[in-house]
Regions:
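C-terminal segment of classical bacterial N-terminal signal peptides
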Residues: 7-15
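Charged helix-capping and loop-helix junction motifs
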Residues: 123-126, 158-162
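Bacterial N-terminal signal peptides that target proteins for export
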Residues: 1-2
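Transmembrane beta-barrel domains of Gram-negative outer membranes and organellar outer membranes
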Residues: 15-139, 143-152, 167-175, 179-231
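Charge-rich, low-complexity intrinsically disordered segments
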Residues: 154-159, 165-167
Length: 231
């Protein structure tokens, strides 16, 4: 759960987990009583024309509540160097359709952004719909759309986005994966990399994010995520 990603232009990050690929939500939902924790680390070691060096740490927790619903909390805005822009992000995802053997699934979700320090806005929101199809080859592709309210990812503007995912298991433990938010805004990145199941409970994600804007000027960074299923 980036992406969600780096706080840019007053924007905030969104949830990550295999409740996301890297940044874009999946149609996966935790079973009732299941608890998942993840720490997302974004970093750029050098300055560039488009993006200066930084590091960012975003913890979040997700809990399955039953009835194909999960809830969670992200703590975004911990970016160095820079002013503290801590933002609490309660999240909710509801799987409204699970086709089982036909491979189709649909979720709807929402994230509420509540800035705590150095506020660029009082409260923001991201709502989305995501559709995924799993094929007999275990390939899973997804597409959907989302909407960010004013100031969340662009100053003084709202943003509608397209969102896309791709996953292909290579072994029982390793999957190549990619996701993408369309548009020029704080979450407008394409991220590709791998997902490795270290143990039954521990999963590692590693990817590289390239911006939709100013990619040739160095708008890119490394993303590493560590996820743990408690039960």
């Amino acid at each position: 759960m980036v992406v969600l990603l780096l706080v840019l232009y007053g924007g905030q990050t969104i949830a990550h987990a295999q409740q996301t690929i890297f940044n874009v939500p999946t149609t996966d939902v935790l079973d009732k009583g299941k608890v998942y924790f993840e720490l997302d680390i974004s970093a750029k070691p050098n300055d560039s024309d488009a993006l200066n060096k930084f590091s960012s740490f975003v913890p979040h927790v997700v809990v399955g509540t039953g009835h194909n619903i999960e809830i969670g909390l992200n703590i975004a805005g911990n970016v160095q160097p820079g002013a503290d822009s801590t933002t609490l992000v309660p999240v909710l995802k509801w799987r409204v359709y699970n086709g089982g053997d036909n491979g189709w699934a649909i979720v709807v979700g929402t994230h509420v952004f509540i800035p705590v320090h150095n506020k660029a806005y009082d409260v923001g929101n991201y709502t989305y719909t995501m559709v995924q199809k799993t094929f007999k080859t275990k390939t899973r592709v997804g597409f959907g759309s989302g909407f960010f309210t004013k100031d969340v990812v662009v100053p003084n503007a709202v943003r509608g986005v397209g969102q896309f995912t791709f996953e292909q298991p290579v072994t029982n433990k390793f999957t190549i994966a990619s996701d993408w938010y369309t548009g020029k805004h704080a979450n407008g990145y394409w991220t590709s990399g791998g997902i490795y199941k270290v143990t039954k409970k521990l999963t590692a994600y590693s990817g590289y994010s390239v911006g939709n804007a100013n990619a040739s000027k160095g708008n890119d960074f490394l993303l590493v995520e560590i996820g743990y299923n408690f039960n």
